């Protein structure tokens, strides 16, 4: 899609959040209405990207700045999310970043499953989220 914005916009869809419009908002740009992911949905989409495991520290840098996420929308998205990997990574990063909205989440309503995930072949095991992540991310402060 290339219009008068002097850029190419790549349209992508995902199904891991169920309802395709959950967490999607309308933004007006140059008198055009465009559907965009809310920050709450966008960070989950980043974690769902096929190459996300190679850039988890970069995604964590983004997570650190997401201080104003809406807990009710985050809760709804997490409950709708079908990817246990995405949910575990999101919750790990939110907790690690110390976001106040994290404390408002009802984690007992979020199904994290029981299987163990190895995001990276070598790294640090995070018992609470039953996953192995890169040492770089685990040790970042």
PLM region spans:
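Short gly/ser-rich loop at a beta-strand->alpha-helix junction or flexible surface loop bordering the NTP-binding
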Residues: 1-19
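Hydrophobic alpha-helical interaction segments
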Residues: 21-141
């Amino acid at each position: 899609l290339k219009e008068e914005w002097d850029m190419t916009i790549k349209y992508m869809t995902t199904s891991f959040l169920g309802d395709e419009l959950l967490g999607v908002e309308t933004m007006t740009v140059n008198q055009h209405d465009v559907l965009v992911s809310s920050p709450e949905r966008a960070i989950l989409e980043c974690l769902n990207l096929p190459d996300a495991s190679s850039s988890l520290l970069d995604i964590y840098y983004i997570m650190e700045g997401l201080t104003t996420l809406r807990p009710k929308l985050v809760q709804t998205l997490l409950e709708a999310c079908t990817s246990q990997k995405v949910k575990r990574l999101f919750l790990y990063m939110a907790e690690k970043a110390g976001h106040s909205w994290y404390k408002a989440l009802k984690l007992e309503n979020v199904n994290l499953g029981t299987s163990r995930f190895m995001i990276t072949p070598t790294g640090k095991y995070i018992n609470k989220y039953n996953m192995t992540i890169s040492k770089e991310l685990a040790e970042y402060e």
